[in-house]
UniProtKB/Swiss-Prot annotation:
Protein name: Chlorophyll a-b binding protein CP29.1, chloroplastic
Signal peptide: none
Ligand binding (chlorophyll a 2): 143
Residues annotated to bind chlorophyll a 5: 259
Binding site for chlorophyll b 4: 206
Length: 290
């Protein structure tokens, strides 16, 4: 009975398999092989991606990193800081835990592991890597969409009301809540709570989606009521146009913020000032005089 239990424990996928002493002299180690659930099938070999020589890059003659293979929409091989480089993990051997030894040795580094793809949906999260390139693409697109709305809002409000975007909050606090000059029947505190609840609910629903493609492009009657993405070829063009406009909007709003900090004026006022004297009213003159 004892021999049968010992043999079963030695062959158990949970307990692990004892490594012969000849492999690691002077220490007793176990190689744990966990076998919960069904055994995963070997991944199918996919065709090797080929990168064409006429692929557009961010700079003529630039060398694209290996992890930017052109598969993402709007990928021009620009990653000077290597932020999208796949994470590399060290694999350690198990520490020696043999009570019969005078000294137990720590596990050594036995190799490295690199995730091939970071968009692996699980019941709890859509990505296997928090700082992976797929997660960065989602953040870039979401921030770009907010920047497009913010840029349009900053220009529209200043054009229609004359109030700059950086002073909009002060006007609301002094004169009360309003929209395009029309008073609203809500206080600032009520509007803040409405914004928190509405945006919080939307973000909660978006983060509940585990499909990385649907997280970026949900589509449907709410987000594509005109059916513009029905044609796959047209969809690719629209996605490329969106990411280009998103990047331009993020740079534009960064310029709005720098202008507001340097001059205290809005973007339209700064633009009119520059057009009145283009040779002497530039960003260089502004910073040199401040």
């Amino acid at each position: 009975m004892a021999a049968t239990s010992a043999a079963a424990a030695a062959a158990s996928s949970i307990m692990g398999t004892r490594v012969a002493p000849g492999i690691h002299p002077g220490s007793g180690r176990f190689t744990a092989v966990f076998g919960f659930g069904k055994k995963k099938a070997a991944p199918k070999k996919s065709a090797k991606k080929t990168v064409t020589t006429d692929r557009p890059l961010w700079y003529p003659g630039a060398i694209s990193p290996d992890w930017l293979d052109g598969s993402l929409v709007g990928d021009y091989g620009f990653d000077p800081f290597g932020l999208g480089k796949p994470a590399e993990y060290l694999q350690f051997d198990i520490d020696s835990l043999d009570q019969n030894l005078a000294k137990n040795l720590a596990g050594d580094v036995i190799g490295t592991r690199t995730e091939a793809a970071d968009a692996k949906s699980t019941p709890f999260q859509p990505y296997s890597e928090v700082f992976g390139i797929q997660r960065f693409r989602e953040c870039e697109l979401i921030h770009g969409r907010w920047a497009m709305l913010a840029t349009l809002g900053a220009l529209s409000v200043e054009w229609l009301t004359g109030v700059t975007w950086q002073d909009a909050g002060k006007v609301e606090l002094v004169d009360g809540s309003s929209y395009l000059g029309q008073p609203l029947p809500f206080s600032i505190s009520t509007l803040i709570w409405i914004e928190v609840l509405v945006i919080g609910y939307i973000e909660f629903q978006r983060n509940a989606e585990l499909d990385s493609e649907k997280r970026l492009y949900p589509g449907g009657k709410f987000f594509d009521p005109l059916g513009l993405a029905a044609d796959p070829e047209k969809t690719a063009q629209l996605q490329l146009a969106e990411i280009k406009h998103a990047r331009l909007a993020m740079v534009a709003f960064l310029g709005f913020a720098v202008q507001a900090a340097a001059t205290g004026k809005g973007p339209l006022n700064n633009w009119a000032t520059h057009l009145s004297d283009p040779l002497h009213t530039t960003i260089i003159d502004t910073f040199s005089s401040s």
